[in-house]
């Protein structure tokens, strides 16, 4: 029998053969690896794996040599199947996890040290692999920290395998990435002339939550966030030695004297006075804009996560709770004033999202 490595590939393998060999490779190299095999069976398995690699080398070598000769241009993978725009983009931009991503613009950080994590969990990340399938899915612990998407080998890793800023990207569900039972669990993060990132979540619901959270942050980045320009920054520092008007908070979390109005002759119950004063402040500040709540859908938000107020002026709510936003006066500090079930308090804007797509 001739040595497989000495045979040249006269033509690409038919698609049916590629699919069959891909299934055999997965079964032999991955599934059987976790089985308790006898010594003889292991030897047979290893021999079969070697034969598969020899066959792969025949059909990949010519294409790889051609790609090298053309100074790094993409080679045509005979096992990749018919090209599509998604696959071509993935092949162009999806490098090994260990390679620096996007110029390595973020310093190494442990998974447990990430600040302000908005969404985190295990996902399968798609990467290019020189196998019959053309791609492989790797389990990664992913986290959205502020506006940066990090991915790790596990949630205990001391350094990320890669990361990228989501600014300028688009996020959408994509059920064409897989043909198995997880096809409805896939989503991708893409942008023109940038690397495309493709992931599989544990369930369609989890994938939708990732897409929802990423889109929320992207929309928030382009929303009416008050810019802190030089003039505003100067006003803040110039007025340090002088008292500010009661309507302008001096720190990110307004103190009681700044947001609660004095209510005479109601000092017996301090908590009640604060709540009523806060309610009056909020209602007075937004009375001219709220209008009829039954039709003012843009002000209805819902909780993304459980939130327990650390101070008495902060609203506590659970994931899915409906909150009516009364004011965005403290938007620059990351806080809004909301009302839920008659209670009024400060709401961290990163913990809520719009209920209605208007």
Swiss-Prot record:
Residues 62-88, 232-254 are annotated as: Disordered. GO terms for cellular component: cytoplasm; cytosol; nucleoplasm; plasma membrane. It is found in: Cytoplasm. Residues 243-253 have a biased composition (Low complexity). One of its GO terms (biological process) is B cell activation. Keywords: B-cell activation, Cytoplasm, Phosphoprotein, SH3 domain. It comes from the Eukaryota. Residues 116-219 form the PH domain. SUPFAM superfamilies: PH domain-like, SH3-domain. The modification Phosphotyrosine is found at residues 75, 151, 197, 260. Residues 296-357 form the SH3 domain. The modification Phosphoserine is found at residues 5-6, 87, 90, 223, 282, 285. The SH3 domain interacts with FYB1 and PTK2B. Interacts with FYB1, which is required for SKAP2 protein stability. Interacts with PTPNS1. Part of a complex consisting of SKAP2, FYB1 and PTPNS1. Part of a complex consisting of SKAP2, FYB1 and LILRB3. Interacts with LAT, GRB2, PTK2B and PRAM1. May interact with actin. May interact with FYN, HCK and LYN. Interacts with FASLG. Belongs to the SKAP family. May be involved in B-cell and macrophage adhesion processes. In B-cells, may act by coupling the B-cell receptor (BCR) to integrin activation. May play a role in src signaling pathway. This is Src kinase-associated phosphoprotein 2. The gene is SKAP2.
């Amino acid at each position: 029998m001739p040595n497989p490595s000495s045979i040249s590939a006269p033509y690409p393998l038919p698609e049916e053969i590629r699919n069959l060999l891909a299934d055999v490779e997965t079964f032999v190299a991955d599934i059987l690896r976790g089985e308790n095999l006898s010594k003889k069976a292991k030897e047979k398995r290893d021999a079969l794996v070697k034969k598969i690699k020899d066959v792969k080398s025949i059909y990949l070598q010519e294409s790889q040599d051609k790609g090298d000769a053309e100074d790094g241009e993409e080679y045509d993978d005979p096992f990749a199947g018919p090209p599509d725009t998604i696959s071509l983009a993935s092949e162009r931009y999806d490098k090994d996890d260990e390679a620096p991503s996007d110029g390595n613009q973020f310093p190494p950080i442990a998974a447990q040290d990430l600040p302000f994590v908005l969404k985190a969990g295990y996902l399968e990340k798609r990467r290019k692999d020189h196998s019959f399938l053309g791609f492989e899915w790797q389990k990664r612990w992913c986290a959205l920290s502020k506006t940066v998407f990090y991915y790790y080998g596990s949630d205990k890793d001391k350094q990320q395998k890669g990361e990228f800023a989501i600014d300028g990207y688009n996020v959408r569900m994509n059920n064409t990435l897989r043909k198995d039972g997880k096809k409805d669990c896939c989503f991708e993060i893409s942008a023109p002339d940038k690397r495309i990132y493709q992931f599989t979540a544990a369930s369609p619901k989890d994938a939708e939550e990732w897409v929802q959270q990423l889109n929320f942050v992207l929309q928030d980045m382009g929303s009416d966030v008050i810019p802190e320009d030089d003039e505003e920054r100067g006003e803040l520092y110039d007025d340090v030695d002088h008292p500010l008007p009661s309507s302008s908070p001096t720190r990110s979390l307004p103190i009681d004297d700044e947001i609660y109005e004095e209510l005479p002759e109601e000092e017996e119950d301090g908590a009640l006075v604060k709540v009523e004063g806060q309610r009056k402040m909020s209602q007075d500040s937004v009375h001219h804009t709220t209008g009829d709540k039954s039709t003012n859908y843009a002000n209805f938000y819902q909780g993304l996560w459980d939130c327990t107020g650390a101070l008495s002026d902060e609203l506590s709510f659970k994931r899915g709770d409906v909150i009516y936003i009364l004011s965005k006066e403290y938007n620059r500090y990351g806080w809004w004033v909301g009302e839920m079930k008659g209670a009024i308090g400060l709401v961290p804007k990163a913990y809520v999202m719009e209920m209605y797509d208007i």
